[in-house]
Amino acid sequence: IGRLVGSEMCIRDRYIIPTPIGNLRDITYRAIEILKKSDFILCEDTRISRKLMEKFDIKSKLLPNHKFNEKKNLSLFINHLRNDKIISLISDAGTPGISDPGAILVRECVEEKINIFPLPGPSAVSTAVCISGFSEKYFFYGFFPSKMKDIKNDLKFLTQLNSSIVFFISPKKVN
């Protein structure tokens, strides 16, 4: 995991920066500061991220990093880090790498011994758990598969757990 020297960022560092879920004003001052100092910001959807950048006058270059190009761009991103560039990873909402792109790049950074510094912030999982009334153990599942057969198989497994279960459903699928 990454580090700070004094209050300055280290070169060749990569930051995982949670973004607001719903209300742009929920972002932290520290997140804004690091985003402004980043050479590149890897984001899921540049159209969505641009709204956040404009709101807080962040001029760093946005590079798309989504499930369709994440593997293809991996060597480019690692090369930027090797050239002492500061890269921040954000998602459209919440914490990157949790049911969002980012895990592939994190794994590669760990293998390459490139510092990773996660910032605390919004997480849909912790937000859901804190208002559920179940404060003890829980199991985070992620998104359900798209095929009903796979959903049924997964539900068989999940019903065997002795804990609360948190899962995501796309807003497009909720009716």
Where are these predicted regions, by residue range?
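Short glycine-cluster motifs
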Residues: 83-141
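Short glycine-rich anion-binding loops that position phosphate/pyrophosphate groups of nucleotides
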Residues: 21-22, 92-96, 171-173
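Single conserved hydrophobic/aromatic residue that forms the stacking wall/gate
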Residues: 1-11
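Loop/turn-to-beta-strand initiation segments
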Residues: 14, 84-88, 163-164
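Glycine-rich, highly charged phosphate/nucleotide-binding loops
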Residues: 69-77
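Beta-strand/loop-alpha-helix module characteristic of Rossmann-like adenine-cofactor folds
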Residues: 126-175
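A short beta-strand/loop micro-motif in the catalytic core of glycosyltransferases
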Residues: 39-45
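Conserved helicase motor
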Residues: 65-70, 144-147
